[in-house]
Amino acid sequence: MAMVACGLSVLLAAAAAEEYPHAFPRAGTKQLFDNERVTAWEVHWLKDTPQPIHRHRFDMAGVYLRYGPIRVTSPEGVVSPDRPPFEVPRPYFQKKGVTHREEAIGFSPDAPERMAVMFDVKDKIVDPIVPPEGMARAFPRDGANKAIDNDRVTEWDYTWKVGQIVPTHQHDKDSVQVFFQGGSIKFTAANGKVETKTFNFGDARFIPRGTIDSEEAITGSPRAITIELK
């Protein structure tokens, strides 16, 4: 009888855990785009706004664009210790299954509001493309810093400089890109087509694997975190 009761308790606990909503959407979030590889979210930890306990049902990759203090609480009510401020942009990765509440409640009115762009990384796995002979991959490249590398993603921090051309390359993996500093970049495709795009702080985009181009900053010093999906 005791074993039956114990088993029932385990099942009830598992069922309760399954009832937690996914981390997104919630107050302060906006979906940017969605495809077979990722769902992109702009996330603001709104001040003095209660949030539900939620469960991250996907691996999550992203980048914090602005620091702000938050309080993290487990389903059991345990509050994590406050952490010191961090520099931005801050690349981030978290495995699925994390369950908690994140709130910016009880801090100074002058405290900044945390902001990030986060990606739910879906379970679909896609093999990388082998670039044509003699053609470089998009990453690594000169000046790019590898911030995170694991079995799901590689995250690169890179700043374009005016007049400095990134030679023709192929994105061998599907990638997402989040801009921390804005500016305009000229892209020259394999067929010679030229397109100039202007990016602002917080902009995010998806780059399909197989994309071939060269890049050159035209204005500003665009800086972005590029997340290659494995």
Locations of regions flagged by a protein language model:
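Cleaved targeting-peptide boundary
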Residues: 15-22
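A short glycine-rich, His/Asp/Glu-containing loop-to-beta-strand
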Residues: 25-53, 57-65, 138-168, 172-177
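Bacterial N-terminal signal peptides
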Residues: 2-13
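Ligand-binding loop in jelly-roll beta-barrel domains
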Residues: 96-122, 182, 208-230
